[in-house]
Amino acid sequence: MGPLWFCCLPLALLPLLAAVEETLMDSTTATAELGWMVHPPSGWEEVSGYDENMNTIRTYQVCNVFESSQNNWLRTKYIRRRGAHRIHVEMKFSVRDCSSIPNVPGSCKETFNLYYYESDFDSATKTFPNWMENPWMKVDTIAADERFSQVDLGGRVMKINTEVRSFGPVSKNGFYLAFQDYWGCMSLIAVRVFYRKCPRVIQNGADFQETLSGAESTSLVASRGTCINKAEEVDVPIKQHCNGDGEWLVPIGRCMCRPGYESVANGTVCRGCPSGTFKASQGDEGCVHCPINSRTTSEGATNCVCRNGYYRADADPVDMPCTTIPSAPQSVISSVNETSLMLEWTPPRDSGGREDLVYNIICKSCGSGRGACTRCGDNVQFAPRQLGLTEPRIYISDLLAHTQYTFEIQAVNGVTDQSPFSPQFASVNITTNQAAPSAVSIMHQVSRTVDSITLSWSQPDQPNGVILDYELQYYEKNLSELNSTAVKSPTNTVTVQNLKAGTIYVFQVRARTVAGYGRYSGKMYFQTMTEAEYQTSVQEKLPLIIGSSAAGLVFLIAVVVIIIVCNRRGFERADSEYTDKLQHYTSGHMTPGMKIYIDPFTYEDPNEAVREFAKEIDISCVKIEQVIGAGEFGEVCSGHLKLPGKREIFVAIKTLKSGYTEKQRRDFLSEASIMGQFDHPNVIHLEGVVTKSSPVMIITEFMENGSLDSFLRQNDGQFTVIQLVGMLRGIAAGMKYLADMNYVHRDLAARNTLVNSNLVCKVSDFGLSRFLEDDTSDPTYTSALGGKIPIRWTAPEAIQYRKFTSASDVWSYGIVMWEVMSYGERPYWDMTNQDVINAIEQDYRLPPPMDCPNALHQLMLDCWQKDRNHRPKFGQIVNTLDKMIRNPNSLKAMAPLSSGVNLPLLDRTIPDYTSFNTVDEWLDAIKMSQYKESYASAGFTTFDIVSQMTVEDILRVGVTLAGHQKKILNSIQVMRAQMNQIQSVEV
């Protein structure tokens, strides 16, 4: 059982290295008398003797076997324990065989006893401690394995016994040893006192220092190891146990070399991966050679950077070879059929070393002249799709007739986005043939009588030439189409007469060009009036005719009165203010049934406007919780509102600072008078006001994410394009509502737009732009014509003439679009306000922000038309954004750096890196100065090293925002391209 048990002992319990023994006392090293204390004096005797190697040593012997009452003690000198908890005693001695002594009494013994006595200092005397078992502590009775006889003495044969005993725990500063003899005949040749400790060892990647053994033979003293240089703990804290014999047992846990370092010298050293090799993860595995087309720039690399012109996709593992962009597709074949086209091609000669090759089709319409080509509209259809084609063919339809097109077939793969260069492409030029117009999409009923119906329709989406005329086909619904009648019309409106009363008719229309008729539209059903309906409509119109006449008369009188009043006032008010006020009176007739905004400053008593449009709230219903900001008139707080019978809601509370003037109070509450007239999901909602107690408050719904510009900057790069378009659509819908009410905002900007927890954007800050004349602290607003104007957001006619209209709000909305797509970047960057005015006067416009779809930038440019009459209405903007949301593919085409638009764009390209002396200057130029220290501490201090940075390197220096990562990576890619250009010139 014993041998079998030993074979099955777990390896973890076997000692790793031999114990270290530290000697406290060794009698063999004495060069003079030992001077140990004996009792009685006739007992032990110190003599010179020889060890087994015949070296002279000092020994003690005793042999009083023929004497009576033998109790002989031998006590060592004071021995200091030096921190040891368990003491070991090695004794070498010889014992005479009692049977070999002639006439020996029966009391002869062949053993002796070992004792110890602890003391904090050397306190022993001739009589202390007492020469008896108590106070001494007995260790053991020592017996000899071998005894010598008279024969051995004659032959000079030495039979020396060696015994080791241990005792503990010891706690005092030192101790004495004592040897007791009872009628024995023996010689104590050597005594060595020592303690054991576990040696310093490097095991499992950790360094364990020397550790004293425990106080008991079964003790296990835990010792924490420290990982060797460039290693880290795995799983659990690493430790081993030192047993009572000074042996390491039970190792737990381990350390492994960090990424970039491999284990050498039997696991005692973590060495940095040599140049040309790398190690990506922590572990025992060694460094491996860099994949193809990659290299390392220093020792200890965790990955290999791609060589110039080669890249690694975000999803590629680090041990994958670096690849490059594919070459252009080959052998393009085109087949044109009227206004459709089939394109086929063969794959590129070089796929770049990757298997994820796909194709993108870029369609450009070049018209029939020699003008610049523009991207095709959304009406062109691509089958199976325009982007991400896996097969080398595509069918394109719904092209315009007699039109020249250029199609670029781009070859792209997983690293195309990593390259600073545009994808390689093959292009083909085609001209479409003559084709008939497309079908009319929809018809509208303009009016009807008992015997006639007037219809109108829009032009076909693709007329494919000049529309010569239209043919309208109609028949009674309950009859066959064979009974149809055709009517021709040179315009898109026709009145069909001689119809039956109260009858449903089916109508279809088609357009004609020189190429012939197009397809009929879908069937539309319209019904003539019955006689009863006709009589009823006549009776209903009679009061309307009388009322309209009366209203017209009242309107004329009102205009005359206004003119007289204005003349009497001698044009006391400025032209812009008069125009604004007159607009409120004269535009009401434009949208019947539509609520019209009323300027509170037209009230003789502005407090009356507050009472009319804002609900008074009792102060007891309002609970202010914390200050979240400061406004023009006082603090902005968050809190709760609990109205009787309603649930408690979270609200924002604007307070009027103490010491206000009556004018400040009136101006403060005017915003509530304005806001209280609005009710739209994309316009901030007024809950009410507190005017009958102090402080005066305006209470609105609470918007959790605060102002849009700050929110975007805090979440740079975190949203999809569709999410951003959704935000823009909300702002446009709110502005359409305000424009329909004839309200001009004057200060539309991302800072004046609030965002709630559902990313719903709401227009806010109403009427405050009227009072900015008193605010000299905000550099956003610059003096112009006696007032303060936010130059960067304001239309040129409003800057020059203070002519604010819904069209000038559209200009501001275009700037808001730019702010949203750039994640809150400052419009016109660090240009001065005067430089902005000059640039706009010279027809310069902002370029597309990074990753901005072309369709969105084109909409911005439409908003920035110099002629305000050419700018889109907010309703048109909402419709355009709705189309983009319904057709996300329209947002995939990114705006080029140099747009094909007529307006020149301000240059905000990345400057040449050679114009900078240091990496810090380069970071300043790309507005990433907050990462200077991180770059320096990580060793990225030269342009050569920076140009080789990868996404992993950028993450390692602490750039965690996706937008910042993309901006830095784009700049590095441009830097590489500039370096390659310089190298090619040098060659």
UniProtKB/Swiss-Prot annotation:
Glycyl lysine isopeptide (Lys-Gly) (interchain with G-Cter in ubiquitin) crosslink location in chain: 892
Q: Where in the cell is it found?
A: Cell membrane; Cell projection, Axon; Cell projection, Dendrite
Q: List the disulfide bonds.
A: 63-185, 98-108
Which regions of this chain are Extracellular-facing, per the record's topological domains? Answer: 20-544
At the top of the EC hierarchy, this enzyme's class is: transferase
Where are the active-site residues found? 747
Which residues does the UniProt site feature Cleavage point to?
A: 536-537, 562-563
Q: Which residues lie on this side of the membrane: Cytoplasmic?
A: 566-987
The post-translation modification note in this UniProt entry reads: Ligand binding induces cleavage by matrix metalloproteinases (MMPs) such as MMP7/MMP9, producing an EphB2/N-terminal fragment (NTF) and a C-terminal long fragment (EphB2-LF). EphB2-LF is further cleaved by MMPs, producing EphB2/CTF1 which is further cleaved by the PS1/gamma-secretase producing EphB2/CTF2. Polyubiquitinated; ligand binding stimulates ubiquitination. Ubiquitinated by RNF186 at Lys-892, mainly through 'Lys-27'-linked polyubiquitin chains.
Q: Where is the Protein kinase domain?
A: 622-885
Query: How the protein sits in the membrane?
Result: Single-pass type I membrane protein
* Reaction equations catalysed: L-tyrosyl-[protein] + ATP = O-phospho-L-tyrosyl-[protein] + ADP + H(+)
Query: Where does the Eph LBD domain lie?
Result: 21-203
Cellular compartments per GO CC: axon; dendrite; plasma membrane
List the SMART domains: EPH_lbd (SM00615), Ephrin_rec_like (SM01411), FN3 (SM00060), SAM (SM00454), TyrKc (SM00219)
Q: Specify which residues bind ATP according to the UniProt entry for this protein.
A: 628-636, 654
Any one GO MF term held by the record is: transmembrane-ephrin receptor activity
The record's family statement is: Belongs to the protein kinase superfamily. Tyr protein kinase family. Ephrin receptor subfamily.
Q: What is the role of the protein in this entry?
A: Receptor tyrosine kinase which binds promiscuously transmembrane ephrin-B family ligands residing on adjacent cells, leading to contact-dependent bidirectional signaling into neighboring cells. The signaling pathway downstream of the receptor is referred to as forward signaling while the signaling pathway downstream of the ephrin ligand is referred to as reverse signaling. Functions in axon guidance during development. In addition to axon guidance, also regulates dendritic spines development and maturation and stimulates the formation of excitatory synapses.
Its subunit composition reads: Heterotetramer upon binding of the ligand. The heterotetramer is composed of an ephrin dimer and a receptor dimer. Oligomerization is probably required to induce biological responses.
Tell me what this protein is called.
Answer: Ephrin type-B receptor 2
Q: Which organism is it from?
A: Coturnix japonica
